[in-house]
Each structure stands twice: as C-alpha cells, then as structure tokens.
Regions:
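An alpha-helical support segment within catalytic cores of ATP-dependent transferases
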Residues: 9-20, 123-163, 173-174, 178
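ATP-binding glycine-rich phosphate-binding loop
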Residues: 17-45
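A conserved alpha-helical element in kinase catalytic cores
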Residues: 35, 48-91, 95-98, 103-124
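Active-site beta-strand termini and strand-to-loop segments that position acidic
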Residues: 41-47, 99, 173
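Activation segment
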Residues: 57, 102, 168, 177, ...
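Conserved catalytic-loop position in the HRD/HxD motif
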Residues: 164, 169, 181
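Active-site Asp-x-Gly
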Residues: 173-213
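Helix-rich C-terminal or lid/interface subdomains of diverse kinases
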Residues: 196-269
Length: 269
C-alpha cells in the first residue's frame, strides 16, 4: 500500500485528531504497519507519544482492518496498547494508540527474547471478548485453501486469535512483551496462536522440530490433537503459496518457504 506522512494529510483531519490528543509537534513515519496508508509515531505538545495508523475510507479492506482493531482494543489491553481515539474525518479513518516503548522481537534460534515471547503468546489464551465484536472466523478465512473439510473443522472455535505474530508485532520492552497490530484478529481454535508463532519461528531460522519445541509448554499447543496441527500446517502452506507467491517482500518469501518446510515436516512424521 502507498504510504502517506502525517504532514500530507488534510488539515481538517489534523484538527479532528488534535481535538483528542492535543497539538502534534513532530511526526515520524513507522516502518511497521504495512497494511496501513499511514503509520507514524507522533509527539504532542504535552509530551505524549502516540502511534497513529489510518487509511482512506474508500479503501474497504483497510477500513475493515481498522474496524476490527478498534473493536477488539478494549478487550486486549492486558497485552496490547490502549486505543486513545478513533477518528473519521476528511475522507480518512484514523486510530491513535498509546506508544509502546520497545523493539521488535528477535525470533532467531537461541534468542534471549524467546521465553518472554512465549509468555506473551500464552497470555493470548486468557483473552475473551463479547460475541458482538466483529472478528473474522478463522476457519472461514482459510476456507479457500483447505482441500479437505476436516482441515476447516479443526480451525473452528471461539478463542481470540491474533493471527499475525511476526516479530514486528511483538515489541520487547524493559518489563514485558506487548502484542500490537490486531487488524487480523479472529475467532478460532486456541492452538492457532502458538501454531502461528511456530510458523514465524521457522521463517526466522528455526528447524520445524525446534520451533515446535519452543511452544511445547503452551497449554493451547499441548492440548491440540496432532492431526489438527497437521491440517493447520497443510492449509497455511497452500494459502501462503497461492496468495503470496508473487510478493517480493523478503518476509513474505521467508514465510512462504517456512510454511512449505513445516507442512513437509508434519507430513513425514
């Protein structure tokens, strides 16, 4: 998605946002939040730092992501930043979150970040939200890629899922790990959260067996039927191969390779 900087947004949008947060004196583009036209850290005159993300309201997909993120925000504050304001003005939808002091997690084999990352993923299993919160159904999201109906059945459930646990979405701070970017939040089987981490660990250099060992103490993973994990790995491999084959972004290519590697490992067990 083409990016825009804070200073290039319509003045009426600036005014609408600043009505909530006060005057902005500095804005720094963020390298994260690739699905948003705007992703920036802003500094206010009062000394506050906030993370802003937004998109034009005529971009239905991006606005849908923002809708989900705003809807789930009140229910994930135990491990995610608080939503400060939600603004629609001048043809834009904009969310402002508390700024998180932290760096992207290091998922490499042997990384000292891994225990805290696993703790954060374990905490996902404690989350819940009302039925009316408009999250995606995980099994429906992947229905295009499942060759066998059993693959979809094992993905269904009511657990709150993040579904994009790449290292840029887990920020390591002095005391804790914060999980950001809930645009793809879904409901589904609880084991999907640790399984998503496994895929991302493989993309960062772990062998499949090593990645699975990292999450072996996570209850949602430990309680999952091996066949369910097999179906997940197979479905994800097909999805990434079909949907992201043409993507040139290095991370997308790494996950495409990781998904195939993991599926073949599960098949050979």
């Amino acid at each position: 998605m083409d990016r825009i900087e804070w200073g290039s947004l319509p003045p009426t949008l600036h005014d609408a946002v600043q009505d909530h947060i006060g005057p902005v004196i500095k804005a720094e583009p963020s390298p994260e939040g690739r699905r948003s036209a705007l992703a920036a850290t802003v500094h206010t005159r009062a000394g506050q730092r906030l993370f802003l993300k937004g998109a034009p309201i005529d971009n239905a997909r991006s606005v849908g992501d923002l809708d989900r993120e705003a809807a789930i925000a009140p229910y994930v504050t135990a491990i995610a930043p608080e939503l400060v304001c939600d603004v629609t003005a001048a043809g834009w939808r904009l969310l402002a979150f508390d700024y998180v002091e932290g760096r992207r997690a290091n998922y490499a084999p042997g990384s000292p970040d891994l225990p805290a990352v696993v703790e954060a993923v374990t905490a996902l299993d404690t989350l819940s939200c009302p039925d009316e919160v408009p999250l995606k159904w995980f099994d429906a999201r992947w229905s295009t890629y499942a060759a066998d109906p059993r693959q979809l059945a094992v993905l269904a459930g009511t657990a709150v899922l993040h579904t994009d646990l790449n290292p840029g979405n887990l920020l390591v701070g002095p005391q804790t790990v914060t999980v950001v970017d809930w645009a793809m939040a879904s409901r589904g089987a609880a084991f999907v959260n640790p399984a998503d981490l496994v895929l991302n660990l493989i993309a960062c250099g772990h062998a499949p067996a090593e990645a699975e060992a990292v999450v072996h103490e996570v209850a949602a993973w430990r309680d999952a039927e091996p066949e369910a994990v097999d179906h997940y790995a197979r479905t994800v491999a097909v999805a990434w191969l079909q949907a992201f084959w043409s993507y040139t972004h290095p991370w997308a290519r790494a996950v495409v390779r990781a998904a195939q590697h993991w599926a073949l490992y599960r098949m050979a067990r």
